[in-house]
Amino acid sequence: MNVYQSLLQPFVFQTLRADPETVKLQLLRLGESIERHSDRPPARWIKQQLAQTFSLPTPELSQQLWGLTFPNPIGLAAGLDKDGVAAGLWGSFGFGFAEVGTVTYHPQPGNPRPRLFRLPADRAGINRMGFNNRGAAALAQTLEQAQKRSARTIPLGINLGKSKVTPLEEAVEDYLGSFRLLQAWGDYFVINVSSPNTPGLRSLQTAANLEPILSALQNENQARRPLLLKISPDLAWEDLATIIDLVKTYQWAGLIATNTTIARPELQTKVIPQTGKSPQEEAGGLSGAPLKQRSTEVIRFIHQQTGGQLPIIGVGGVFTAADAWEKIMAGATLIQVYTGWIYEGPGMVKQLLTGLQTELQQRGLDCLAALDRQP
């Protein structure tokens, strides 16, 4: 247990009983301030100190994928930095890539608060944020300004969602609008059709609704950016198989498995202090440790169905190097974290990388790319 887990995390989670969203926003404001002034000595020094503390050079874990170089396979999942305000900072925390968003074409406030809950006894979270963000145009401006200040050090993904005000039958144009505004600023793009917190969004995972989205975005993709689809862990296997076929048909770059779940497995948490309700009564997506097994099962299914030929970003319940390795062995090419990072603290990425190095050494492998994972 590190200093963050033994002192700071309990203070924030229990002593203050703070609204998790308030804490997150305060941290993002600090990150935004550092990022905005990163071309000046004080902020530049802070970034250097963060990198010295939390980064770990791991050339044996680097990956070449989609024409991009990932310094290591551990990335920040979408949802934390929705508006990209700290996009240039995440590499200093040791991440090998980062994903901003989810962003929508129209700015939107999201769902009413409280909408983010921590379940420490389960190492989990529930959120029903509802894609709160400043909009695609604002994100494009933010990323353009960041690019002028300093060169990007890690690949940046942009996660696109459908605006709540946009009818489902107009979803294609909504996604296209965001993609056109942001195409120049992302190294890869993710289409989110699997969040449980936008009414009707998950219905876009059906073949009839999904195919026009995949086709239109690939046709618009003149710069040939890698396009990925983020899927739900709650899909039936036959529905997932249909999605895999469509992704292959339209030559998309890969899948992100998985989003949060609407399932409520048996949890230790009985009452959420902010609302006085049980987790079963709270709407929203469940993330963290309870999602680990299901997300890994989905990763393994995709890997088997595609013969290991379709890249997968694995996300869901990663807290330790063993968790990350399990997903890699199931078929994940890259790994994302979010809830685990909140619980484990900023030193988590370094711990994961150290553990992954050990896994390679124990198997006598020189690099992660040499790993043989039979479908």
Curated annotation (Swiss-Prot):
Instruction: Extract the Pfam families matched here.
Output: DHO_dh
- The residues that the entry says bind FMN are 78-82, 102, 159, 192, 230, 258, 288, 317, 338-339
Q: Does the keyword Oxidoreductase apply?
A: yes
Main subcellular location of this protein, as a coarse class: membrane
Details of cofactor binding:
Binds 1 FMN per subunit.
Report which superkingdom the organism of origin falls in: Bacteria
The record lists the catalysed reaction(s) as: (S)-dihydroorotate + a quinone = orotate + a quinol
Output one GO MF annotation.
dihydroorotate dehydrogenase (quinone) activity
Name the catalytic site residues.
195 (nucleophile)
Q: Which residues bind substrate?
A: 82, 127-131, 192, 197, 259-260
- Compartment annotation: Cell membrane
What UniProt keywords apply to this chain's record, in alphabetical order?
Cell membrane, Flavoprotein, FMN, Membrane, Oxidoreductase, Pyrimidine biosynthesis
| Protein topology in the membrane | Peripheral membrane protein
Required co-factors: FMN
- Disulfide bridge map: none
PROSITE patterns documented for this protein: DHODEHASE_1, DHODEHASE_2
User: Can you list the GO cellular component terms from the UniProt entry?
Assistant: cytoplasm; plasma membrane
Q: Which PANTHER family match?
A: DIHYDROOROTATE DEHYDROGENASE (QUINONE), MITOCHONDRIAL, DIHYDROOROTATE DEHYDROGENASE (QUINONE), MITOCHONDRIAL-RELATED
Query: What function does the entry list?
Result: Catalyzes the conversion of dihydroorotate to orotate with quinone as electron acceptor.
Name of protein: Dihydroorotate dehydrogenase (quinone)
Species of provenance: Cyanothece sp. (strain PCC 7425 / ATCC 29141)
